[in-house]
Amino acid sequence: MRAATAACRDRRGLCRAEFARLAEAVTPFWLHKELIMTTLTGQARLTNSAAYEQVWQAERQACRTDADPDTLTVGVVVVTRNPAFFQTGLSVLNDIRDYVFNRVHIQSEMPLKLLDLAADSLYLAAREKALHFLKGQNKAINVRIIQCASLAEATGKIIYTHALEQRPEFHLGMLFYDQTTPAGVDDSIEQIDRDLDAFYSALQRSGIPAFYTTFSTVAFIRQLRSPFRYLPQQYREIVRSEDPAIFQTELLCLWMDFFEMNYTNRRVKPIGALALHNTLGEQLIQFFERTAAERWLVSYYTGSIISNLIGYLDRHAEARGALILRGPNEHAIACGAMANWQLYRMPFLGVVTSGMMDEFKGTLANLKETAAQGIIVAAENRGNQWYSFQGTLTPTEDMREVLIARRIPFVYIDDVEMIGAGLTEAFRLYHQGQGPVVILATQNVLESTLSLEGAVCDPSPIPVLSADDPLPMSESLAQAIALINRGPERLVWQLGPVSDDEYALIHDIADAAGIALVDSLAHPGSAPKYYQGRRNPHYLGTLAIYGYSPRVYNFLHTNDKLNAMSEQSLFMIKSRVAQITTPFSDGRLERKVHLVQLTHDDRHLSAYADLHLHMNCLAFLRTVKAHLDVDPALRERRRALIAAYLDSPSDVVSQLPSLPMSANYFFCQLNRVIEELIETEGFDFTGVYDVGRCGISAARNVAKTRRGFSGWYGRALMGDALLATGYLAYTSPSHVMAFIGDGAKGIVPDILPAFIDNILTHPQLLNKSITVFYLCNGGLSVINTYQERILFNRTSRQMRLVNVEQPDVEQTVNNFHIQSKTLTHFDEDVIRQALTTSHRLNLFSVVLGHNNEGDGISPGHRQRLAALIRADHDALQERKAWAAQQPESTSTAFDQDPTQEATS
């Protein structure tokens, strides 16, 4: 018997029977305030700290005769070490006791004492409104107030007490979390979020219901957070006022918000975070789970009528292969999708609200151009609505006609019964591989919870020619192989968006045949200067409308004239021969360049190509490798010719440390550091290049180790690369380095807030360095150069950009270091450390001056290159002879010897 009694005792040493007798003996608190402050029921806890327990019971005459006493007990948890905090809260609840409380049970580690509340006019007005509202309610509730010093103690106490209840009817209501303990510091938002999530999860696992909404949990902190502030996910955050009147009014408002929005709202059920089904969300998750080879990307910008769909994706998509990232706007969704499709073939799902299809801007056309596979869900109005808010189906416009004009496939679903058929058609269009598919869906469709088992058909992908199938030896293929095996000494391959497997074959073929490789402004790094940590002996440089390298220019020209078509041939691999890919005019392409084009799309076959290879790239490369038969002497002459053209700067400015720095100087110094890191530490990075002079300079002058992403692709939209950086930071397997001009920076939103949001969700993906160079020269430099070098005009206001210097900032978020710093000089130590330190975002604002020198931007620079070629003709011939005499070896044998370089 003695053991049984001990087992049923609670933590204060009272068994249930004793507790019940004591509770009945307590004087009703409503009528005797002075007794409330002095009468205590309870005993000391087993620990050294004191414990207090009190039960207050309203007398019958104090309750409304028409009020229905609720058998539910609502828990109010107060986590604090501050007696004044707790006692002020008790006093406020006591002040609105009429019409609301039937029974109050208090468990506290602090003395129970009511304070004299401040007679403030605002508080009195709030109290009057609260009582007026409470008079209209037809129930009185039971409340259990639990005060603890920590969340862990509160968790244990609630679970323990709940386990002892014979008929548990306890639902957790409000949680007041005090972070203002003297001599303490506020926890970070993410730490409080994690602690609260663990608290509510523990209650849920123990079967304890809770009103778990934004009105149920409040944390009080000392001061506003700085420099980064964001919305907590599990609670509301308030700075505790030092003014007692303000503090008591805030507590009253918080309680009434909870009571009105949760307890009296029967749509809110005390069962924790309610996970509603969403038909469209589940079907899209299942589709990408079936079709995506590995990860698939989800990104959204929320709106009211798509918030349920987004909430479902947030809860369920990641566990089924999705990576959910956010950007600062809808435009960023398209940029992130394009970059990740081009570099990693990652399909995507984008979700936007009504009227936002236009916010994708020209990047939507780029997604179509690059054939990025993905689905965009956009909210739309019903066709019979009259000028609906944000709708684009009105008597004067129709978004569907816009999509038709842009040749972007879409489906419009405005009936829940048609979801199955609409998704079947959307999936069929997706498998055609012609770019993103748009689903325009009305609110009833977006919020549907109906089951669609068996109602959606996923057609099989359209069969394509497999790279494993042997290519028939067509006449054009035979001619291409003959050019490789027996063709001219100058054989150049410009690489488009080749995959890793394709480049591995290209590298082997170039090594065996002596082929020179170049990349382009649209696909920088497709032919890297360093491959697998070693200098790539086949790499010449960049060939493009802007930014063509001196080595490439010298290789293709003699005395400022293109070499004869019989002496050289240019292969353009996976290319449309777009204007951006070469500096050559239409006339030169037609009459002066022997061009071989490889593309799988017959719509891309160019009229300038002398030889068309309409076939799969990987299959072509495998066929070429199988038929390689290059004469060793020809191969050595080709190799010697490549090695003879050196990778030296073409202008003096690149060596001159002026102030402000020139772009030439900054990138020359940066390249020196990066090449040293590659060669000594195996440094590897993904480059991101925005539209502008400095993006050109970086693509041309900074060594690359792998394919990067370029904003110059397609429409060449300023800002695309910057917005894509926020996504590539989480998907790139290497460090990330972005080169963004001040023009591009100013044309799109700041990426830092969205970047921090993703840090809070995916910190495990950031074991790398992300560096963004904001290159600030105060003008739109490419236009400036056009005006000054081509039209011989002075610069004008239209090219001017205003840069406002910001103070340097360093901050840590979720164990990730962020630094923002202005660089006026090239600080090698700072840059080296930034590039090689993981878990770090570096935002460098680099102060530069404008000039028209170098980087292959203007014809004037081309003429200076020609003069340099003529002046150093003898040195070049000596270099060719030296290279031809070197013994044959592996691909690392052609590393540059700085002591033997000559200007070319």
UniProtKB/Swiss-Prot annotation:
Involved pathway(s): Antibiotic biosynthesis; prodigiosin biosynthesis
InterPro entries: THDP-binding (IPR029061)
Cysteine disulfide links: none
GO terms, biological process: antibiotic biosynthetic process
Co-factor requirement: thiamine diphosphate
EC class of the enzyme, as a word: transferase
Keywords: Antibiotic biosynthesis, Thiamine pyrophosphate, Transferase
UniProt similarity note: Belongs to the TPP enzyme family.
Role, per record: Involved in the biosynthesis of 2-methyl-3-n-amyl-pyrrole (MAP), one of the terminal products involved in the biosynthesis of the red antibiotic prodigiosin (Pig). Catalyzes the decarboxylation of pyruvate, followed by the modification of the resulting two-carbon fragment acetaldehyde at the C3 position of the 2-octenal (1,2-addition of acetaldehyde) giving 3-acetyloctanal. In vitro, it can act on a number of alpha,beta-unsaturated carbonyl compounds, including aldehydes and ketones, and can catalyze both 1,2-addition and Stetter-type 1,4-addition depending on the substrate.
Protein name (database record): Thiamine diphosphate dependent-3-acetyloctanal synthase PigD
Organism encoding this protein: Serratia marcescens
